[in-house]
Curated annotation (Swiss-Prot):
This is Transcription factor E. Belongs to the TFE family. The winged helix domain is involved in binding to DNA in the preinitiation complex. It holds the Pfam family TFIIE_alpha. The lineage of its organism: Archaea, Methanobacteriati, Methanobacteriota, Methanomada group, Methanococci. The gene is tfe. Residues 3-88 form the HTH TFE/IIEalpha-type domain. One of its GO terms (molecular function) is DNA binding. Transmembrane segments: none annotated.
Length: 173
């Protein structure tokens, strides 16, 4: 399940690029119910790093926790447990959100004309270019028309790929 490239991509997105998140999941799967302190000790990372990753997993509903009060210290402690049975739902939801975002970008690209500055490598909509008199506000160079047909093609391919993954990926069935 965690070896599926689509699942890995969604988890990577949930962890906001922090690959330690995969190690946290591995420890949770190995130990089942465990404390954040035990995870931090096993991975050799700071407790706040583990907590941040656990909170991200919790926000995605991929872990749950139990809270209890230590009678000696009066501090609350947490034990965490994986709830990865929800992973297919989470992956579908994230992929559908991504498809919607890509479709919005595609619509924007199709419905606008663009110009760019070859010096500064900055792109402008037609309206922005017109406001600047078709000269770059950064360097003063004349703006050139930007052909976004390749970008449109790439967006269409990404959308098609993700829709096919949703339909055909055995993990998401």
């Amino acid at each position: 399940m965690l070896n599926d490239p689509l699942v890995q991509e969604v988890l990577f997105n949930i962890f906001e690029g922090d690959e330690k998140g995969f190690e946290v999941i591995d420890v949770l799967l190995e130990k089942g119910e465990t404390t954040e302190e035990e995870i931090a000790k096993e991975l050799g990372v700071k407790l706040n790093v583990v907590r941040k990753l656990l909170y991200k997993l919790y926000d995605a509903r991929l872990v749950d926790y139990k809270r209890w009060k230590d009678e000696d210290t009066n501090w609350y402690s947490y034990t965490w447990l994986p709830t990865l049975e929800k992973l297919p739902y989470v992956v579908k939801k994230k992929i559908n959100e991504l498809i919607k975002d890509l479709e919005k970008k595609l619509e924007f690209e199709k419905n606008n004309m663009f110009f760019f500055c070859p010096n500064c490598n900055v792109r402008f909509t037609f309206e922005e270019a017109m406001d600047y008199g078709f000269s770059c506000p950064g360097c003063g160079n004349m703006l050139q028309e930007f052909d976004n047909s390749e970008l449109i093609k790439d967006l269409e391919e990404q959308i098609k790929f993700l829709k096919e993954e949703l339909k055909n990926n055995p993990f998401l069935k």
